[in-house]
C-alpha cells in the first residue's frame, strides 16, 4: 500500500521523493523531500517546516523562504538517497515494514502484511491495507475484528506555544499526554535537571515567576494520537456511530456549552417529526395532535409552502405555534365536510383547554375555499378557548401577525372569562358569525384587520375593560364593533380605529342600566356605515350610561357631496335610554354628507366643531368675571375696530363698530328690579313689527304723526286704538301747524288739533 494513505502522524517518519523545486508545486506533508541541484552538480533534499499545505514559489529553497526553522531545512543528499535505494528502501511512498516498525516502536521483524488465513502469535503485528497496525492471537480474517486490537501510533514531537498573560505566573497546563518534554522560554532551552522547572502530571511548574508576554515553547515527545479511522464491532461502546447521531436520541450524544446536551437546547418541534405530510390532501390530524402533545413549553414550527389538513385539535398545555409569515403560502386548513365520508366538520378546529397561555406567531389558519356548514349547531370555529368556569382569572391566548379566516362560526373565540389576551397585527376575515368574539376582561386588540362577517359583527365583546385600538372593522353584516355588558359596570376603550361600510352601526355599546359610563370612543374614523339601509343605523350607537367619552372622531362618506348616494348613517351619534356624553361633541362632522338626519338625535348635548358651537338644553352657560364692570362677552365683526356688543354683569352695550358701544340697557343699583336704557331707550314704533308694551298697553306710531295706544290686544292697523294727546304751544291761528290729538291751553281757551293744521278752541270758565 502507499504510505501516504497512512495517518499524517505515520507519514512524518517516511521520506517521499517529490522531485525538484518548481513554482506551483504543492507540499502537503513533512516527509516530502524536494531536491535542489547547485552550480557544482550537488543535489540536496529539503524538507518544509512551515505551515501546510505549502505552494512553492521559486526554483530553490533560497528563493522560497530560505533556510530556517520555519521554512526549509536540508535533510538528505542525493548520495544518501541512492544508498537507501541500494538497500531496497524506496522513497516512493510504498510501505516499508522496518520503517513502520520504527514508527510504532515494534521489534525488528515483528511486523508483517495482513493476509487472510494466516495465524498470528502474541509476538506478531500486522499492517492492514488501510495503514493501521493490529496485534492478537488467532487466524486473520478478511478485516480486523475480535480477537485483534489496533496498535496506536506514538508521534515523535508536537510543538505547543503559550504566551504568559499576567506577571507572576508559575504554572502552565499542557493539554496533551506526553512522555518527555523540552521547554524554551523566549527561545532559551530550560534545564529541568538544574531545577528551572518540574513536571507534575500534565502541568509544568517553573521555579522562577514568569513575566507577562513571555513566549513559552514546549516540544512534546511520544504523544498518543487518538484519531482512529476504524473501530472493531466489539469497541462500539466507546464511540458514537452515525446511526447513534441520526436516531431520535442523537442530540443527547452531543455536548453543549456551558453544560448539558444539544437536546436540552432544542425547543422547537415540527409536524414532520411526527409524520405530517402538509400537502393539503393527506389527513395530518394524528401527526399534528402528536406534535402538539409533545410540545409542552416548546414551539411547534410550521413550514412555508405546506398546508396541513386536519380535523379538530386539542391544545392541553402552554406552548407556541410558529409559522413563517402570515399568508406566506402555508397554512393549517380544516378537513372540511366530506359527503362520501358522511363527515360534517363542526366544533373548533384548534381548541385551547389549558388554563395557561398559548401563543401564536406568524401563522395562517385558513378555511376559505373549504366546504363547511353554515347551519347553527354544525358551524366550525377556527381558533377558540374553552370557557373558564373556575371562578379565578385564567390567561387568554396571544396571537401576533397571524391570519385566521373563512370559518362558518367565529374565526376566533377568546373563551368565556378568559382574560389578558392579546391580538396584534392579525387578520380575521370572512366568518359566518362574528369574526372575533371576546367574553373575557382585559383583552388588548390592536392593529388588526377584521371584516366581512356574513351574518354578524366584526368584533363582538361581551365583558368589561377591553381595549381595541388602531384596527379596521369593515363590510360586516351587522355592526363593526359591538359591545354589550350584561351585568355590572361597563368599561371599554375604542381608540384610533377605522369603521368602514358595516351593515348596521359603526360602533354599538349597550350598558345594562343608567350607570356612570366607562366608555371611551375617541380618534376613530367612520366611513359609509348603515349599508343595510342608508340613514337607518348610526356611526355611534350608545344605550344607557351617563357621561360616555366621545371625542375627536371623524364621520365621512365616500362621496363628499350633499345628498351622496353612498351609504351614510342616520345620526353620527345616537343616544338611547338616557345615555349622555361627558362634554362637548367635537367630532369632525360635515352637515352636507356626514349623516342623513343629523349629527346627534337629542338637543340636550353640546356641540363644537368646525361648523358651529351649540349649547344643548342640558347645560347652562356660565361666565364668571371679577366685577360688575368687567366685560364677559364681546361680539364684533372682523373688519371693524370696535365691538358691536359688550355684555357685563350690569349692562348690555350696543354699538355700530365705529366707536366703543355707548348705549343699551342696564340694571342700576339705585333702581333695583328695573331695567333702564343707557343713553335713551326706543323702538321703531311700527304697529305690526315693533309695538312698545307697558303691561297690557300697546303704544305705537300711527303713521300720521300721531302716537296711538290700545289696551289688551295688538293693533290691527296703524290707525287702530286711541291717539295719545300731547300738549304743545298755543297756536296763533286756527291753521297753525299741528297734529291730530295735540292740545294747548292758556288762561282763556283750551285748544284742540282736530285735523292736520286745524285747530279749534273753547272758552275756559273760572274754577
UniProtKB/Swiss-Prot annotation:
One of its GO terms (cellular component) is virus tail. Signal peptide: none annotated. One of its GO terms (molecular function) is lyase activity. It is found in: Virion. Keywords: Degradation of host capsule during virus entry, Degradation of host cell envelope components during virus entry, Host-virus interaction, Lyase, Viral attachment to host adhesion receptor, Viral attachment to host cell, Viral tail protein, Virion, Virus entry into host cell. Functions as a receptor binding protein (RBP) and probably mediates the attachment to the host capsular exopolysaccharides. Displays a depolymerase activity that specifically degrades the K30/K69-type polysaccharides of Klebsiella pneumoniae capsule. This is Depolymerase, capsule K30/K69-specific. The lineage of its organism: Viruses, Duplodnaviria, Heunggongvirae, Uroviricota, Caudoviricetes. The gene is S2-6.
Amino acid at each position: 500500500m502507499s504510505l501516504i494513505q497512512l495517518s499524517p502522524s505515520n507519514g512524518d517518519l517516511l521520506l517521499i521523493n517529490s522531485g525538484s523545486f518548481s513554482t506551483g508545486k504543492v507540499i502537503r506533508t513533512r516527509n516530502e523531500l524536494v531536491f535542489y541541484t547547485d552550480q557544482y552538480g550537488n543535489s540536496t533534499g529539503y524538507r518544509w517546516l512551515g505551515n501546510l499545505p505549502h505552494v512553492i514559489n521559486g526554483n530553490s529553497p533560497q528563493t522560497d523562504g530560505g533556510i530556517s526553522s520555519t521554512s526549509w531545512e536540508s535533510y538528505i543528499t542525493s548520495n544518501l538517497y541512492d544508498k537507501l535505494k541500494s538497500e531496497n528502501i524506496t522513497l516512493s511512498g510504498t510501505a516499508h515494514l522496518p520503517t513502520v516498525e520504527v514508527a510504532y516502536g515494534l521489534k525488528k521483524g515483528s511486523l508483517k502484511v495482513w493476509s487472510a488465513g494466516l495465524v498470528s502469535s502474541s509476538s506478531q503485528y500486522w499492517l492492514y491495507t488501510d495503514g493501521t497496525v493490529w496485534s492478537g492471537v488467532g487466524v486473520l480474517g478478511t478485516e480486523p475484528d475480535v480477537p485483534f486490537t489496533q496498535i496506536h501510533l506514538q508521534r515523535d514531537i508536537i510543538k505547543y506555544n503559550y504566551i504568559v498573560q499576567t506577571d507572576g505566573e508559575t504554572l502552565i497546563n499542557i493539554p496533551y499526554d506526553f512522555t518527555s518534554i523540552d521547554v524554551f522560554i523566549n527561545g532559551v532551552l530550560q534545564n529541568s535537571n538544574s531545577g528551572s522547572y518540574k513536571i507534575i502530571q500534565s502541568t509544568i511548574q517553573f521555579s522562577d515567576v514568569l513575566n507577562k508576554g513571555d513566549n513559552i515553547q514546549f516540544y512534546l515527545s511520544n504523544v498518543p494520537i487518538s484519531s482512529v479511522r476504524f473501530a472493531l464491532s466489539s469497541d462500539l461502546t466507546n464511540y458514537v456511530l452515525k446511526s447513534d447521531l441520526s436516531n431520535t436520541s442523537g442530540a443527547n450524544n452531543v455536548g453543549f456549552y456551558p453544560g448539558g446536551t444539544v437536546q436540552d437546547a432544542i425547543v422547537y418541534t415540527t409536524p414532520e417529526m411526527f409524520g405530517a405530510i402538509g400537502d393539503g390532501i393527506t389527513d395530518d390530524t394524528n401527526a399534528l395532535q402528536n406534535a402538539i402533545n409533545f410540545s409542552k413549553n416548546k414551539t411547534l414550527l410550521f413550514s412555508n409552502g405546506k398546508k396541513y389538513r386536519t380535523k379538530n385539535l386539542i391544545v392541553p398545555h402552554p406552548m407556541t405555534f410558529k409559522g413563517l409569515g402570515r399568508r406566506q403560502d402555508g397554512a393549517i386548513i380544516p378537513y372540511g365536510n366530506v359527503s362520501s365520508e358522511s363527515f360534517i366538520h363542526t366544533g373548533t378546529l384548534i381548541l385551547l383547554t389549558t388554563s395557561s397561555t398559548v401563543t401564536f406567531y406568524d401563522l395562517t389558519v385558513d378555511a376559505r375555499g373549504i366546504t363547511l356548514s353554515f347551519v347553527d349547531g354544525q358551524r366550525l370555529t377556527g381558533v377558540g378557548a374553552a370557557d373558564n368556569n373556575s371562578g379565578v382569572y385564567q390567561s387568554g391566548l396571544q396571537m401576533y401577525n397571524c391570519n385566521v379566516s373563512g370559518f362558518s362560526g367565529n374565526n376566533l373565540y377568546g373563551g368565556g372569562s378568559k382574560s389578558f389576551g392579546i391580538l396584534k397585527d392579525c387578520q380575521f376575515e370572512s366568518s359566518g358569525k362574528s369574526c372575533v368574539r371576546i367574553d373575557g376582561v382585559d383583552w388588548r386588540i390592536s392593529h388588526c384587520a377584521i371584516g366581512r362577517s356574513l351574518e354578524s359583527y366584526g368584533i363582538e365583546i361581551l365583558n368589561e375593560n377591553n381595549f381595541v385600538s388602531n384596527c379596521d372593522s369593515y363590510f360586516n353584516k351587522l355592526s363593526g364593533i359591538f359591545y354589550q355588558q350584561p351585568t355590572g359596570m361597563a368599561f371599554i376603550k375604542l381608540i384610533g380605529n377605522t369603521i368602514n361600510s358595516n351593515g348596521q352601526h359603526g360602533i354599538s355599546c349597550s350598558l345594562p342600566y343608567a350607570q356612570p359610563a366607562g366608555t371611551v370612543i375617541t380618534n376613530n374614523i367612520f366611513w359609509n356605515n348603515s349599508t343595510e339601509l342608508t340613514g337607518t343605523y348610526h356611526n355611534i350607537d350608545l344605550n344607557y350610561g351617563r357621561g360616555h367619552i366621545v371625542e375627536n372622531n371623524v364621520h365621512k362618506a365616500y362621496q363628499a357631496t350633499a345628498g351622496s348616494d353612498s351609504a351614510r348613517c342616520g345620526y353620527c351619534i345616537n343616544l338611547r335610554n338616557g345615555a349622555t356624553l361627558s362634554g362637548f361633541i367635537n367630532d369632525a362632522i360635515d352637515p352636507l354628507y356626514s349623516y342623513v338626519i343629523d349629527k346627534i338625535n337629542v338637543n340636550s348635548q353640546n356641540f363644537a366643531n368646525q361648523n358651529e358651537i351649540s349649547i344643548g338644553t342640558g347645560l347652562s352657560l356660565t361666565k364668571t368675571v371679577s366685577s360688575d364692570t368687567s366685560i364677559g362677552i364681546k361680539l364684533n365683526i372682523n373688519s371693524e375696530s370696535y365691538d358691536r356688543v359688550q355684555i357685563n354683569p350690569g349692562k348690555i352695550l350696543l354699538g355700530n363698530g365705529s366707536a366703543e358701544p355707548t348705549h343699551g340697557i342696564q340694571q342700576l343699583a339705585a333702581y333695583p328690579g328695573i331695567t333702564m336704557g343707557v343713553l335713551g331707550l326706543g323702538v321703531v314704533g311700527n304697529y305690526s313689527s315693533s309695538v312698545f308694551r307697558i303691561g297690557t298697553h300697546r303704544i305705537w306710531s300711527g303713521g300720521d304723526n300721531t302716537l296711538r295706544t290700545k289696551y289688551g290686544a295688538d293693533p290691527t292697523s296703524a290707525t287702530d286704538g286711541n291717539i295719545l294727546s300731547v300738549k304743545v304751544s298755543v297756536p296763533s291761528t286756527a291753521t297753525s301747524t299741528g297734529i291730530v290729538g295735540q292740545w294747548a291751553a292758556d288762561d282763556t281757551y283750551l285748544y284742540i288739533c282736530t285735523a292736520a293744521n286745524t285747530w279749534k278752541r273753547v272758552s275756559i270758565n273760572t274754577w
